[in-house]
Amino acid sequence: MEVPFDAQKWHEALGHPDWYIRLGDDFKRLEALAKDNPDAKTKEPAYTAVEAALHEGQLPLGDSGEDFDEDRRPIDTIVVHHTKNKPGMPLARLNAMHLLRLYGPEYARESRPYHGQPVWSGHFYQDKQVFWGYHWLVRQDGAAEHILDDRYIGWHAGNWDVNTRSVAFCIDDDLTEKEPSHLALRAIAAAIRKNYPQVKQENIIGHCDVVDTVCPGKLFKPSWRGKLLALLEA
């Protein structure tokens, strides 16, 4: 199925501070198409456009703004996610996806004081402002990268209370119907032992335990959550 996507419209709109208002309805349409046909890459052109605009410096970003991290609390919860994409997700792509899916809708809310303003996250990685919601990205080969400082609230769980007191681990793969590699689980366990020894095992949960989603996969609760907890004890 060919997805109708107006590349010129997106290119022009992404040059404005309120791009998320100008493109909000269009992206909602793409999301609706994606729900009707999950296998189609209906949202990919939008992600590509945002990624390119960020890379080229076309998309205006705020240089100051709301302190979204003032609600940060002591970490007592680990939330596990998957990218639901094929392995090898570039950080630039993840950044574009979360800017469009998370920050765009928030800034588009008319009740917000920052409505219509350039998007500002206040989150920085390697001296660049970033918008991804995960603190850790874990590859299937066991490489684990701490991509969001723990002092930042990651926008990942779909529940602000959980966000304020959690860190998010995301496995770089589509785990809807399969388990992550042993190397990936071992990397997560090692990172938890080293950085978050205070988190109780019952508070190591999946995204599916917070909101109605399959993430991080159908086998998380019946199978590989237990394997992760066993590795924590090893």
Residue spans of the language-model regions?
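Basic/polar, cationic surfaces and motifs that engage anionic cell-wall
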Residues: 1-83, 128, 140, 144, ...
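Secreted/periplasmic proteins that engage bacterial cell-wall peptidoglycan
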Residues: 66-151
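Flexible, surface-exposed loop/gating regions in the mature catalytic domains
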Residues: 156-161
